[in-house]
Swiss-Prot record:
Keywords: Cytoplasm, DNA-binding, Transcription, Transcription regulation. This is Probable transcriptional regulatory protein RC0681. HAMAP family: Transcrip_reg_TACO1. Residues 1-21 are annotated as: Disordered. The keyword DNA-binding applies. PANTHER family: PTHR12532:SF11, TRANSLATIONAL ACTIVATOR OF CYTOCHROME C OXIDASE 1. It comes from the Bacteria. Belongs to the TACO1 family. GO terms for molecular function: DNA binding.
Length: 253
């Protein structure tokens, strides 16, 4: 995972996501409902996916009453709302590989929306499996840099069973095997509290540096449009903005 310390560049700008809190809440609620319905139990103690979903929801300050409502909705036998997990893969301009993870109640609608977004911004949607070999599928847990020293959090990650940690100026990013994700998340939450973010995702094995402002803006617009869909849970790409381009874009209104 070395070389991916600028994690903020890989998954688009967090500030842009924060402005869309209503959509973030919608995505979190879908995951809670799906986890409660598809898991072995609606008790988070016995359902790791639901436990992880609740941790993610709390990290984004999803109100407790909305969490409870989502779980109750999943338990309601008259509720026919079911979501299907789908992964879309394709290329953005300049050979950037993109993975889109979705939870949808209408696969045809979501596929059309995702394909249209790729086409509109100069990309192309491929078959499932066309780019995932360029990524590592793993658990990701993020804490603010001031939560602990690099040494202390590294020791905690090793004890918990995580396999890597990268720290930059603002964030400790911990990586885990998928099978250990829930255990590591629970251990670190007990030690440091709820993380800023936690999920199972696709982290690029290598990144392509984007050092042109126009190319970066077009790429980020594609990511933004994809993320605006209620059906899309997360978007991943094997790109990284150069420091200069990142500073220019961050400084724009």
């Amino acid at each position: 995972m070395a070389g991916h310390s600028k994690f903020k560049n890989i998954q688009h700008r967090k500030g842009a996501q924060d402005k869309k809190r209503a959509k973030v809440f919608t995505k979190l609620i879908r995951e809670i409902v799906t986890a409660a319905k598809t898991g072995s139990s609606n008790n988070p103690e016995n359902n790791p996916r639901l436990r992880n979903a609740l941790t993610a929801a709390r990290s984004q300050n999803l109100p407790k009453e909305r969490i409870d409502k989502a779980i109750n909705s999943a338990n309601d036998s008259s509720n026919n709302e079911n979501y299907t997990e789908i992964r879309y893969e394709g290329y953005a301009p300049n050979g950037i590989a993109i993975i889109v993870e979705a939870l949808t109640d209408n696969k045809n609608r979501t596929a059309a929306e995702v394909r249209s977004s790729f086409t509109k911004y100069g990309g192309s949607l491929g078959e499932t499996g066309s780019v995932n070999y360029l990524f590592n599928h793993c658990g990701v847990i993020q804490y603010p840099i001031n939560i602990a020293s690099n040494k202390d959090i590294l020791e905690a990650v090793i004890e918990a069973g995580g396999h890597d940690i990268i720290s930059d100026d603002t964030t400790h990013t911990i990586y885990t095997d998928i099978e250990n994700f829930s255990k590591v998340l629970e251990f670190l939450t007990g030690k440091y509290g709820i993380p800023e973010d936690s999920y199972i995702g696709w982290i690029p094995l290598n990144t392509i540096i984007i050092d042109d402002k126009e190319k970066a803006e077009k790429l980020l617009k594609l990511v933004e449009v994809l993320e605006e869909s209620d059906d899309v849970q997360r978007v991943f790409g094997n790109y990284e903005l150069s420091d200069d381009v990142y500073e220019i874009i961050q400084g724009e209104p």
